[in-house]
Amino acid sequence: MNFNVWNVKEMLSIPSGSGITKPSNWNNNQTDCSLSDSQFLFGSQFCPENSETLLPSLDAGACLRHPKQTQQNSVDSEPSIFIKYQAKPQLLGGDTKDESLFSLPLPVGKSKGLSKQFEEKKRRATDQSDSETLHSFVSHFPEVINKLQTSVEKTEENLSSRSQSILDSVETIAKTFQETARVQHDLMVESVRDKGSMEQAILEIQRTCAARQAEFMEMKSTLKNLEVLVVEQTKNLQQFCDNLSQLIVPGILEELKKFTSVPQVAGHLKDSTSQTSPSLTQSLHFTRQEKHPSEEPATWQAQEAPAGNPSTSSQRPGECGVWDEGAESGVFQKAALPTDGLHRGDGHVKNKTVPTYCKNWVMTTRSVSNHFSNLPSQRAGNGQGLMAQGASQRDVSKFEARVKNACPEYGPQSMCSFDSLEQSATEQKGRPCRKRRRGKKQQPQRSKRGGLLDRKQGQTSKAACAFIARHHCPQSPVCDPQGPLICWLTPRSSTKSTCHILGGTGETSQTARAAQGNLVQHSQRSSTDSSSQGDQQINWFSDLSLENLEPPQCKKGGTNLLCDPDFDSSDDNF
């Protein structure tokens, strides 16, 4: 809606009697009393200088007339109608540009003064409002600044506390990280060390296990060898027990009793009271060799000790014995040694060719020592002459035949030995034993004695031949149960063999005692030595085999245990 039209309608709606209630200033300034408001307004368009004076009064009158409208306009912040009307261009004249169009005969100075006043008032109002706004803003500005300062301070405090807490937390986190890293490093180092030590221990355990395994394997092989050895030893022990079971102990004891019950024959004697060197009796030294649990459980050797001085015409023959286990004869063979007479004069030996036939008596039981330990006392009581023990010619011939059958390849050697023994016995036949007597000559020996000696020498030669044949036979007594159970030892070399005849009233010289003193041998070994017996049993088990059953005495000589020899009755001071 156009403001100008609105203003016209408003002006037309104003009652006519309103001019009476105008203020006094209106009356004072009124040039024409008969003009109404519309006329005035209309005239102001043409005469602006007149309307300027009436403008404040019109404003006041308008406010009084329309209080509600003014209030509404104030609420709406709208300017008054007069201000609007004046602000609008002139109704007829308009702007200065259009002054030529509607030029009215109005004074120009008055119209310009009214507009200037209006503009100044308007400017003043705007300046006042601006100043009030600025004043209010400026008055609030310190408070805002104070608030900003307080807020900034609070923010700084908060930031400082926050930063301090953050720094503290960061420091604690860093320390925690450092401690954790150090602990982890220590743990890793310890774990690496433990791992290295464990690996070293595992290597050591592996080496130890390998060594133990090697030892176990070696032990297993040793156990297998021991088992095999135990089986072999068991077999050998069984064979040994079988061989021992073949021995007849009662028969052996009977043969020993027969041997000890044979009467002893007196030697070749001559009456002489001037005998300087008494003849030494055949002293049997029973020695027990090392006990070998072989085919012959125990071996006893009877030997004669060597003479101390050859000039004293000491007798040095050997003794030998044969044990025949055959069921036919059952006779214990005995051989008597040949004797030779003494040369008249200074007592030197003339017959130097008679060899020692054998060295040892070989027995098969330990009980032989109990019987033979009593023999020296029997011969000492018998005393005078050479003890010669013989056996029947029939038993000797049977023995020789058995030896020849067992060892046919050694037959010529046995015969050769027998011939040599016969020849030596024949040479001894015609030589009488002579002894010097003080101041008297001895009578020649009777031929009867010589015949007896010849017969004894023949039997002795045959027995010695049997011993030699048995020595060279490779078969063992266990393999040939019909053969004699003996072990032949190597005979000594030929020595001076003489026969000393003990005179009834002759005195023993100091040299004879010295010769007898040399008969004692001190190399003896206790029969109760259990440790030596255990070693001997081990040696026997190692030497025992089915192919070679030779008696251990033939392979390895043992230490002999000597018994006390028998002496002459005149040797009481020995």
Curated annotation (Swiss-Prot):
Q: What is the annotated tissue distribution of the protein whose record heads this document?
A: Detected in spermatocytes and testis (at protein level).
Query: In which residue ranges is the amino acid composition biased (Basic residues)?
Result: 431-449
Q: What's the superkingdom here?
A: Eukaryota
Q: Where is the composition biased (Polar residues)?
A: 372-381
Coiled-coil intervals: 217-240
Q: Where is the composition biased (Low complexity)?
A: 272-284
Query: Could you confirm whether the keyword Coiled coil appears in this record?
Result: yes
- Describe the outcome of a gene knockout: Mice develop normally without obvious somatic defects but males and females are sterile due to defects in homologous synapsis. Oocytes are depleted in six-week-old females and spermatocytes in males undergo apoptosis at a stage equivalent to wild-type mid-pachytene. Complete synapsis is never observed and incomplete synaptonemal complexes are detected in meiocytes equivalent to late-zygotene and pachytene.
| Record note on quaternary structure | Part of the MCD recombinosome complex, at least composed of IHO1, REC114 and MEI4. Interacts with REC114. Interacts with MEI4. Interacts with HORMAD1. Interacts with ANKRD31.
Q: By what name is this protein known?
A: Interactor of HORMAD1 protein 1
State the organism's lineage.
Answer: Eukaryota, Metazoa, Chordata, Craniata, Vertebrata
